[in-house]
Amino acid sequence: KDIAFGPMNYGVSEEEAKQQARELIKLVGLPEDILTRSPFDLSGGQMRRVAIAGILAMNPNVLILDEPTAGLDPRGRQEIMNMIYRLHKEKGLTTILVTHSMEDAAMYADELIVMNKGTVAMKGSPREVFGQHTQLKEYGLDVPESLRFMLKLQEKFQLEASDTVITFSEVVEKVQHLMQQGERL
């Protein structure tokens, strides 16, 4: 009902809205039988997927999500973020994601905008923004755990500062490269 509500208010027939709801529920990775279940029987992650399907039913050009993974367990968080990223790529949706999760920002964002006291403080790719980790700390933000780990390695082993690594797979590649060059870690 929640998914069909918006389109029906804009004149879409009930049958067409229900058909669209069935398609959207699959698109967000849920089984069709969820449409007959009470919202009180759904997990937090399922409720968020249903809410996103309801938004998608309105065929938006822009999807704005504020902390869509707050309160979810790590698996649920990753599933929701992967789904949002997939929808962004497949449907060509401009997606604006408000988050305090630097890991999500590093993994999924094409561009970051850091706000400080209501103004744009920084703007750029995740690599560019996280490369300015000292300035981020001034704004009360941290860097992804992977970059924090790499910075500690550089400090402990007196390694030259190198390209900003923002994912753990990049950390692994960087450490392997350093070891192949004879660095003792």
Predicted regions and their residues:
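Conserved ABC ATPase "signature" region
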Residues: E16-D33
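Catalytic Walker B motif of ABC-type/P-loop ATPase nucleotide-binding domains
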Residues: L63-D66
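Conserved ABC ATPase signature
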Residues: S38-L42, Q46
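Conserved catalytic motifs of ABC-family nucleotide-binding domains
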Residues: N59
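Hydrophobic anchor residue at the start of the ABC signature
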Residues: I52
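A short, surface-exposed alpha-helical micro-motif characterized by mixed small hydrophobic
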Residues: A105-M107
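Conserved ABC ATPase "signature" C-loop
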Residues: K117-G118
